[in-house]
């Protein structure tokens, strides 16, 4: 996929990701040669209109999901439409049935490389003429990107509803009119290579890539999705053009449209824009290579870097549409991982101290795939012990059936997760993409029903059939200086029994039907309100806890009950003033450890009961620590809201902190810090903030080795004291948004939180005194940190800025920053990637906008040989930006862009709930959500240039560089004056 930042990161899938179905539920350009470089179809200068008889033909409908299928008879383009009118946004998603399985040696990675090239222009939409896809979409706001996987490629736009026709035009145009210029390929090659290098520096990605390459010797799944380096570097433009002309046709594609649109008008637009595109003139090249049965265990070891060791075990499985997928997905759920404290792998690997994280995944692919179990080994532990433990758990699955309770929980979890994943239009689009890739959208739609028919006996039979030693592949990732530690091994605890001890009904309440609107009145004032100020009800409990409620559901405005299975969900978001701001010097990890321990058991629910109930509801509920706040967010089926709130209340109010749990979390934290110490991005950032802030400032972070030392001083009393002091109703804001009956939810909240007591924390105030005085320092101050065996270098350039969300000039500064470097495309910094190919990703941003003096930074990653050149280009661009300022055209474009992005950011009830808690904690009114677009449009050019000139200069910025560098003039971890 293309690099992304900001909102795009919230849902973009990793390049090589293949979602398991049970988890669904994130060089100079030469114009002179462009005509000759174009494919024959690119000669067209405008899209052909449809002819009579090109009307889309209805094919089928899934009434439960609200999806309708159509087909264009002229070219067999498949069309899936799903109307969602709860929020005014639309997702347009084009899925091509081509992935890395369609490649061979010599042109591996072509699918992904071509995905990048699909943004490089047509005669109509050409970035060189400032009419490219990113240029025109920026004017309407929203998000666009693409992802590539083994079996498919998809291109998507998420935009305000009025931009739907533009998105359809863009997808129709690039389907057959791509220019594919040689100059574009040359520039983009180094971008793709940098993406590849970033993956090489990630031990988990590297291990997975080698696992597939070892398990598959003949089938194209052997090749990494991104391709082999020499193919990426050497593939000629003509080979990419051949690939494009082989697969990019309407009869190899499915167009998915989801959101707030008019069906009849949209179908007409699709007909007009796509019906004139011809279908493929020849059959699509088949994939006829099959993987023969494996005849013996295969092993490999990757030795590099200094990250924690990893173990991966993989077994061959049938194609995704095989009946065995359902029991295998049940087994995946039963094995679980580090995020589920009641699962078998958690008990066997995490609780015993063998591993710091782990997971099981059934890779559901078009052709036979893999079932993978992976674990990150705790420092000092022999990976062979982890492998042996994994093998023991696999053997248990083949020896006796899973329990009836495990089967029930797995079925419930898979069904609920599937349902909840569809509440976000982008989540639905991506889920459909995976289903189309594996089999068909109908197979995907029937999946949650069919998986309910899987039995414990089928799970046992599948384990016996597929989890065989002779079809196993085992991979180790070992750091170059790997050693085992007898003391660490001696601390391993015996595993606990896997029987479930939870009481699935213990959190249920009698108010379930009352709290969900499908059983209550549809006449609330909020149902017919149009503004968020009118729709959101804000009130305080007598103890000072602030609550925000809003009914947001399909059919709410019309007074119709929400009976659709993909609706009827509720988002809950909480924000507590209890972040790093309230930590003590020498105890910086206490806020983070406290947040982590909240899910380890309460006075009412054991750790396993909490995990079991989360699994039953198909949700996660984790508390995270931030600079100023602790927060959590979750989304449940409406009928599960009382159960979720009961758990939230118990975890926030009555956590049962125990020494054994603290010991485990401290050990996991040590492993996490050790990983950070080998991450170029983490190390570069840590060096940067230590050069900008004094100890005691909230934005300062101790050196990573110091953070490791601090963990040993944290006691149970530190955790208890911190929780008692900062977890109180007066510090807490809770938002409940979705398919609710507000009056019933009020009663529920009063019952769960009404008798909660506690003191309100001191107000947050960040002073300039926490900054290191850099006046008079050289403008090119640079920190360099050497890390061995790194293919990629991370660069962070930053400085503190006296700016926050409540600043009068915040919006002006926000616009100025967006002009400079909102993302890697269509901004001032874009040439660093798009023209020069120096980086996969570059952007500028304010790190923590809640309060002033957080870092404003420019972040990028580059090949080690491109560090100096990249820094020179960035400095030149910023200097020009400072000298000439923002133009009136850039202002107008960014005003429209940011207004659209903001609207798209409120596309789901989960994002709405989070935005409400953010604003409430900063004492900003709900009306800010209604007036954002207007306020952005009211910002003047003078305002923007004044703010940009004040905040976004590099004169006093510090540059931090980390990677495998050859630095002769500067000592390691030094600052050059």
Question: Model-derived features: where do they sit?
Answer:
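Short, conserved secondary-structure transition motifs
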Residues: 193-199, 289-302, 410-421, 636-637, ...
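N-terminal secretory signal peptides that target proteins for export/translocation
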Residues: 1-8
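Bilobed periplasmic-binding protein-like "clamshell/Venus-flytrap" ligand-binding domains
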Residues: 458-478, 730, 945-963
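Alpha-helical scaffold elements lining the catalytic groove of polysaccharide deacetylases
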Residues: 231-240, 710-714, 719
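His/Glu-rich zincin catalytic helix
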Residues: 27, 31-132, 156-159, 168-170, ...
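M16 family metallopeptidases and their MPP-like homologs
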Residues: 82, 86-113, 129-174, 206-230, ...
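Bacterial N-terminal signal peptides
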Residues: 12-30
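Proteostasis/folding factors centered on peptidyl-prolyl cis-trans isomerases
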Residues: 67-71, 237, 375, 456, ...
